[in-house]
Amino acid sequence: MSDEEYSIYDEVEIEDMTYDPALQTYSYPCPCGDKFEIALADLQDGQDIAVCPSCSLMVRVIFEVDNLPKAPDAAASIAVSA
């Protein structure tokens, strides 16, 4: 979607967001009292809009893909039987 299709509340540096490694999501406080959220996988796919699930506000996340945490390798979590 183009910028015209979004009503962006603000731009937020990813360093100002909180990362939850268990959920693999970034969050940032929303003025409504909830949190803007965006998944690590979405950021890695080039998406940069975090949304608040409680209101209509959205923020643009400023980040470099190369600086994101690496997603856990699904194959690495599978035990290999001998």
UniProtKB/Swiss-Prot annotation:
Pfam families: Zn_ribbon_CSL. It catalyses: [3Fe-4S](1+)-[protein] + Fe(2+)-[Dph3] = [3Fe-4S](0)-[protein] + Fe(3+)-[Dph3]; 2 [3Fe-4S](0)-[protein] + 2 Fe(2+)-[Dph3] + NADH = 2 [4Fe-4S](1+)-[protein] + 2 [Dph3] + NAD(+) + H(+). Residues 8-64 form the DPH-type MB domain. Coiled coil: none annotated. Its cofactor is Fe(2+). The keyword Iron applies. It comes from the Eukaryota. GO terms for molecular function: ferrous iron binding; iron chaperone activity; oxidoreductase activity. Keywords: Cytoplasm, Iron, Metal-binding, Nucleus, Oxidoreductase. PROSITE patterns: DPH_MB. Belongs to the DPH3 family. This is Diphthamide biosynthesis protein 3. The gene is dph-3.
